[in-house]
């Protein structure tokens, strides 16, 4: 998540339109009460959580998840939450953070939003 948010906020700071698409487990990063902290860190860090990686990043003086998300919010990065993912996880919209303006949509919405001259990155 850190690199996706860092890349999104950097691109938005350069006045490039950015859309972040959150689906399945990644949607939990947008739940209230820091749901991202409990997400698995990934295959390269077995047993670690997003919170563990965030502590490691901030311990090195790097921006943490909350700071990067705040930058994305400030730069008006568009956040698209997968409608199918919400249903699959049994999450209600009321469980998502109030400070993130998001739209619900799906893969078609995301692809339609991507400009012809833009780039789609999967991290």
State what each model feature region is.
Residues 120-123:
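Short hydrophobic/aromatic patches at helix-to-coil boundaries
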Residues 18-25, 49-53, 110-115:
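Short C-terminal domain-edge/linker segments immediately following a structured domain
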Residues 38-71:
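A glycine-rich helix N-cap at a beta->alpha junction
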Residues 1-26:
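Long, hydrophobic N-terminal alpha-helical segment
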Residues 61-112, 118:
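A charged, amphipathic interaction segment
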């Amino acid at each position: 998540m850190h690199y996706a948010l860092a890349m999104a906020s950097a691109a938005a700071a350069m006045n490039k339109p950015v859309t972040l698409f959150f689906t399945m487990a990644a949607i939990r990063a947008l739940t209230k009460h820091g749901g991202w902290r409990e997400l698995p860190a990934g295959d390269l860090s077995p047993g670690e959580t997003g919170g563990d990686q965030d502590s490691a990043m901030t311990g090195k003086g790097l921006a943490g998840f909350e700071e990067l998300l705040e930058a994305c919010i400030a730069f008006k990065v568009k956040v698209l939450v997968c409608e199918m993912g919400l249903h699959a996880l049994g999450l209600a919209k009321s469980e998502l953070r109030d400070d993130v303006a998001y739209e619900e949509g799906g893969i078609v919405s995301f692809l339609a939003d991507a400009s012809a001259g833009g780039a789609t990155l999967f991290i």
